[in-house]
């Protein structure tokens, strides 16, 4: 299963969910869905915006874990 490590990167950047939401242009509700792993899919455009806002690589945000 793919796990999002958005909270880890947010902590490293000392950024709140609200700040990230504003930078990326995603609602808090949708960002929370991504953060909690409840999202079924993520658009490449969204991943690109997250990486730009958090100054990181996609591999910093995504991690595969065995079920």
Which stretches of residues belong to each language-model region?
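Short alpha-helical elements of helix-turn-helix
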Residues: 3-4, 43-47
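Short alpha-helical DNA-recognition segment
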Residues: 15-33
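DNA major-groove recognition helix of helix-turn-helix/homeodomain DNA-binding modules
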Residues: 45-60
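Short, charged recognition helix plus adjacent turn
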Residues: 8, 28, 33, 40, ...
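The alpha-helix within a helix-turn-helix
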Residues: 10, 21, 51
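A short, Lys/Arg-rich alpha-helix, primarily the initiator
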Residues: 1-16
């Amino acid at each position: 299963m793919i796990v999002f490590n958005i909270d880890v990167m947010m902590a490293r950047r000392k950024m709140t969910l609200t700040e990230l939401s504003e930078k990326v242009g995603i609602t808090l509700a949708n960002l929370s869905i991504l953060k909690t792993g409840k999202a079924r899919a993520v658009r490449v455009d969204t991943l690109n915006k997250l990486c730009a806002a958090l100054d990181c690589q996609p591999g910093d945000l995504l991690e595969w874990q065995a079920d």
